[in-house]
């Protein structure tokens, strides 16, 4: 069974219309450790695939929804849940 890591596209894979610093090294490390990576985004998937090809990313599946069952979700807008008290402190 492959372990899955789901990564948001905008703000994580792509920042300011370029690959984020360190993204290639991170993806290689995930692959070498046996993880499958899936990109989730609300952006047009053809546009995402074009960006990935243009910048030489490995073949990565992209989807419009966060895949269920991932062992990690990497998203620039996420709030790490520790407790509701901690969550509401940020608002």
Which functions belong to the PLM regions below?
Residues 1-91:
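HAD-like aspartate-dependent phosphatase fold
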